Amino acid sequence: MSSLSADRKPPLDYGVQIRFIKDLDDAGGGFPDKSRLANGVGGVSNGTSSPSKYGVAVRVQGISGQPYVVLQDGEKGDSYGVQLKTQPQIQSAPPVVSQTSPYNTLLLGQREGARTPQGSYNPTDQPSSPDEDFGSPLRRPPGDGQAGTQGEAEPRTTERFTPSALAPKLDKKDNDAFNEAGLRKVKQNGIGSSLNGTGLNGSFPPPSSAQDEDQAPAIDTKSLAPINKLISRFGGGGGGSGDILNSEAQTRPRLDNRVRSQSADALNKPSEEASSTSPTINPYAPNTSATVPKLNSTKPSSTGSLGRDATSVAKVAAIPNFKPLAFNQSPKLFAPKEAPPAVPKKPVTPDLIKSQTTSIENGNGEDDQTKQAIYNILKEGSIEKEEAIKRKASLIHERFCGVKAPQISVTDSNMKTELEQAFGRNTQLQQQLDKSRRELQENQDQMVELRMDREGAESRLRQQEDQLAQLQEELRRTLENSPQSDSMQLDLLTVQAELSESQLLRQKLEDTLRQRERELTALKGALKDEVASHDKEMEALREQFSQDMDALRHSMETVSQSQLEIEEERQKVNASILAMEEELEGYKEQSEQWKKQFSSANQELLKAQQGKRELEEKLLAVVKQTDETDSNSVMKELQQCRDSLKKAQSELEKQKAETLKKQEELKSATRASEKRETELKAEIDRLINQLKKEKEELSKAIEKTQQPLVSDQTKDPESNLELQEANARLRERIARMTRLHSSVPDSSSSDALEEENRSLKTQLEESRRAASRLGVEKEELNRRLEEREREREALRRGKSDLEEQKRLLDRSLDKINKEMESMMGDSRQSVQVLQSQLEEFRDRSRRELQDAQRLSKDRLVELQRAQALLKTTQEEVSRVKKELLSCTEERDSTQLDKELLSSRLKNMETELQTDRSSQTDRSREIRLLEDKVKTLEIELDEEKSGAELLNERITRCREQVDQLRSELMQERSARHDLEMDKSALERQIKELKSRIADMGTQSRPSAGVTMLENKVQELEDRLRSEEREKNTIQAAQRRLDRKLKDVTATLDQERNQHAEQRDQLSLRVKALKRQLDESEGEVERLEGVRRKVLRELEEQRELQAALQAKVNAMDNELRKIQQSRRSTLGSTLSSDEEDNYSDTKSITSILTDSPLQTTSC
C-alpha cells in the first residue's frame, strides 16, 4: 500500500474489509532484531518462518459500533478482537518489520490455563539468540490491530512491501506514525519477566483475587469479543444481528472522543518508558512473560476501510497504575472477565454468552453476567415492562445453555441456503409479475385505442345518417318541386352504398374490439386460475405438513430435535421483534414527517389568511380614497374586486366538485373491476369447457381422417388387382384377334379386328388414367395424414409447455405464500402503528373540517356584504346615469351655440361624440358585470352543495374507521386468547413428554403411558384446530389491513387535493391583486377623462357667457341707434322703426331662448 495522505477526510466504512498478508515483513510494526537476522538457533531458521503460522487482518463492524481487527494464528485459527480507531491526519513512515509471528505466545498462554504473568520487563534487555526471536519486544503484539502472516505457504497474497530502514532514534511523534498497511504502530512501556529458553513455552502463574477485584471497575470488555464466532452465527441466525450492527454503525461517536487503549504492564511500572529505538514492543513475548492487555475502547470513532486514507489502528499507550489482567477463557475463545454492574448497556450477544457458559471455570457470577447482558440487549429500544424483559432474558439464557454450537452452525448454514433460494425465487416471481402487469397494461392501452376508434366510427356513422336524413328530405322536396327524380335516386343509392360500407367498417371494428377483450379476459382468467390452483396446492401442502408433524410427534426419538427447533424459532422471534422495533422507529419517523408537513400546511394557511387580510385592508383603503375622490370610480373598483373574489370562489367550488367526481369515478372503477373479475372467472370456466370440447372434436376428426385413409389403403390394392385382370383380358383378346387375322384374310374381318383393337386401346388408356388418378388421390391422402399428425404433435407440445408453465407458476405462488406468512408477523405491528396514524388522521380531518366550516361561514358573510355593496352600487349607477343624461343635454346645448358662433364649436362637437361612444362602452361593461354577478351566485350555490357532500363523505369515513377499530380489537382479543391457550398446551405437552421419557426408562410399560399418549394426541388435535382458527384470524386481519390502506389512501388523496386547492387559492389571490392594481389604473384614467370633460364644460359656459355679453352690447347699440333715428326722422317713419325694433327683439329672444329649447329636447 502507498502512504496515506493527510489531506483527504476519512471515508465511512460499513462492511468488512479483509487483507491477507503474505509475510510480516510487509506490515510490521518495529525494527528487526540484529541477532535474529544474523543466526538462528532453536525453533525458527534465518529468514524463513514456520509454515504452520498464518494470519488474516479482517476489518469487521463491531456490535456497539467499534471496528475490529481479527488476528488468526496457528493450525486451529484462534482469533483475537482488537479495536480500531481512525485518525483525522495521518503521516506514514515505512517501518522495518520483523520476520517471525508473535502469536504463539498468547496461544500457549491460553492453552496452559489462562494465567497472568508476573514480574516486569527491562527495556534494555534484548534477545540474543533465535530462540528468543519470537519474544522480541520489537515484534508486533497480537492485540495491536496490525495483522500479518508468516510463512511461504500463503497463497492469497497480492502485494509484497519492501521494508525500509528507519532512523536509529525516533521521537514520540514517530511512534504515532502509520506503517505501509495503514496501521498505527504500537507503543509499549513494560513487558513481563525473563525467558525460559525457547520463548514458546512460557507459563503464566494464576492471579490473586485482590488484583481481580481492584481491576474490575477499570476494564472495558466491549472490544474483546470473538468476532469470527459472531460472523459465523449472526450471519445465518436470522435477521436480528445484522440489523443491530447496521443500526449501531450509523450511530457512532465522533473522532474527537477517541481514547487510546491501555497497556497492562504500564500500570505496574509507571516510571518505565519505551526507548526511542523500539517503536513497537511486543507485550506478549514469552522471554519476558508479558501480560496480555485488554484494550480499552470506551468511545469508538467513525471508521474507514483497513489501510485506506483515513483509518489506523488504535495506539496502545503506556499509562501508569494499570494492573495485569487475567485470562479465564477456553483455548478457542478469548473472552473478558466479568464486567462491573455500573455499565448500563453492554454490547453482549447471545453467542458470546453461550461461549462463556461453555467454559469450565465459570461460576454463578458469569451466569448473572450473561443474564444481565441479555437483559441490557433486550432493553435497548424496547417499550415493554422490566418484568417481561427479565422473563425473556432468563428463558433465552436457559435455552442457550443446553444448545450445542455445532448444531446451531449447521442449522444456520441451512437457513442461509434456504434464505438465498427464497430470495432468488422471490426475484423470479417479481419479474414474472412485472411482465404480466406490463402485458395487461399494453392490452388495456390497445383496448382504449380500439374504443376510441369505435367511438370515432360511431360518430362518423351518425354524421352519415344525419346526411342521409337531410338528403332524403331534399329528395322529397325536389320530387315535389322538380321532375328530375332519376338523378336524385342515383344519389340516394350512392349514399345508401356509403352507409352500408360504413356499417361494415363499424362491424369490423367491433369484432376486433371483441377479440382484444376476449384476449384480455383470457389473460386475466389464466392469472385467476393460477391463483386458485396455487391456493389449492397451498391447502394440500398444509395438510401434508400437518401429517408430517403428527408423525414427528408420535416418534419419541425426535423429542430433542423438536426442542432445538423450538429454540431456533425463539431466536427467529427475537430477531423478528428487533425488526419490528426498527419498523416502529421508521413509522415514528414517518409520523414526525407528516407532523412537519401538517405544520407547514398550517403555516401556509396562516400566510394565505394574512394575505387575505392585507387585501381587505387595501380594499378598505381604496374605498376611503374613492370616497374622497369620487363615488363613481369607487363603485366601479369595488365591483371589479367583488367580481374577482366571486370568480375565485366559483373556481374553488368547481375544484371541489371535480374532486368529488373523481372520487365517485374511483369507486365506480373499483366496482367495475370487481364485476370484471367475476365475469373473467365465468369466462375462464367457459373457455376451459370450450377447450375440452375442441380437444374431443379434434380427436374425433383425427379418427375420421384415419378411417377413410385406411379404407383407401384397403381399396387401392383391390383396384390394382382389377386393373391387372382387365389388362390380362385385353392381352388375351389381342392375341385372339391376331390369330383370327392370320387365319381369316378377308377385308371385312380385318376391319372388325381393327375396330376391336381400337376399342381395346381406348379401354387400356382409360384404365391407366384411372390408375393415375387413384395414385394422386392416395398421395393427397398421405399428405393430409402427415399434416394432421404434425398438428397433433404441435398440440401435444403446446400442452406440455403449458403444463410446465403452470407447475412453475404454482411453485412460485407457493413460495410467495410462504413468504407472506412470514411477513404476517410484521404486519401485526404495522396494524398497531396504522391505528395510531388513523387516530391522528381523524384529529386532522376534524380540524380541517372545522377550518373549512369557518371558511365557508366567512365566505357567506363576505357574500352578504358583496350583495349589499352591489345594491348600493346599482343605486349609484342609476344616479350616474342621470348625471350622464344631464351632461349630454348640456353638451347638446353647447354644440348648438358652437354651430352658430364659429368652427371651433364644430371641433368640440366631434370630441363630444367620441365621449359618447366611450360612455356606451361603459354601459356595455356594466351589463357584462351584472351577468358575471349572476353566474357567481350560481357557482356559490354549487360550492355549498359540494361542501355538504364533503361533510357526508367525512362522516362515512369516520364510521368506517370506527368499525375497523372495533373489528381489530375483537381480533386482537381472540388472538391473545389463542396464544395463551397455545402456551398452556405446549406446557402440557412438555410435561407429558417428560413423563413419557421417564416411563420409557422403566423396563415394563404401564397403562399410564398409553393414557399419556392419548392425551398428547388430543392436545395436538387441539393445537391444529387452534392453528386453523389463527389462520382465519390472520385472513380477517389481512382484510382489515387492506381496508385501512384504502382509507389511508383516500385520506392522502383528500389531503393532496386540499393542498392543491390551497395553492390555487394563493395563485388566485395574486391574480386578484394584479386585477386590483389594473382597476386602480383604470380608475385614475377615468378620473382624468372626467376632469377633462368638466374643464371643457367650464370653457363652454365661459364662451356662452361671453356670447351673452356680446348680444347685450349689440342690443344696447341698437337701442341707441333707434333713439337717434327717432329724433332725426319724422312721424312717417315711426311705424317702420317700430317694426325693425320688433325684429331685433325677436332675434335676441331666439338667441337667448336657444339653450332652453335644447334642454327641453
UniProtKB/Swiss-Prot annotation:
Bias (Basic and acidic residues) ranges: 755-773
Low complexity compositional bias, start-end: 189-203, 742-751, 1124-1134
Region entry Head, spans: 1-403
Chain spans, region Disordered: 29-53, 79-309, 649-678, 699-721, 739-773, 1123-1161
Localization per record: Cell junction, Tight junction
Keywords of this entry: Cell junction, Coiled coil, Tight junction
Region (Tail): 1122-1161
Major subcellular location class: other
Name of one Pfam family that matches: Myosin_tail_1
Regions annotated as coiled coil: 413-1128
Subunit structure as annotated in this protein's UniProt entry: Homodimer.
Main function: Probably plays a role in the formation and regulation of the tight junction (TJ) paracellular permeability barrier. Note=Localizes to the apical junction complex composed of tight and adherens junctions.
Protein name: Cingulin
Gene: cgn
